[in-house]
Amino acid sequence: MKKLLWASAAVALLAGCAGLPQTSRTAAIHEIKFEANLVPADLTVRVGDEIRWVNHRTLPVLIDIPGLNAEMLSCDRGFSNMFGTARELTELDPSKSVSLCFSKPIVISYNARMRSADPGGMKIEPGTIRVVAPPQ
């Protein structure tokens, strides 16, 4: 019975992975850090590079990327819901990271919403990511 259960689990896993899209990831990883400020606020990467946001703060950070959708992505960790739909807004807990890879050249503007001692209790910092085509 256990062998049948293991075999069924293996078949289900393989069938589930068969439908995953091919990625065009490169080996390059670019970190955007949340510390006292967003660093770097402006970043230029190539198609397929991984952009990784890392929260070094003691409070969660909200990352808001208006217009984000699955068609523009070649990888996604932390920006999609349990159904695989890309979310424009994601919360990043302290000492955690999320990442995206873009599948085509695009300019992305986003906001980082960080809780702070500033009046209003929220510090909003804009960021820009320029995704350029790989060299020919």
What are these regions (language model features)?
Residues 22-50:
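N-terminal edge beta-strand
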Residues 54-57:
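Asparagine-centered strand-capping/turn motif at beta-strand->loop junctions
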Residues 59-68:
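Short, Lys/Arg- and Gly-enriched loop/turn segments at beta-strand edges
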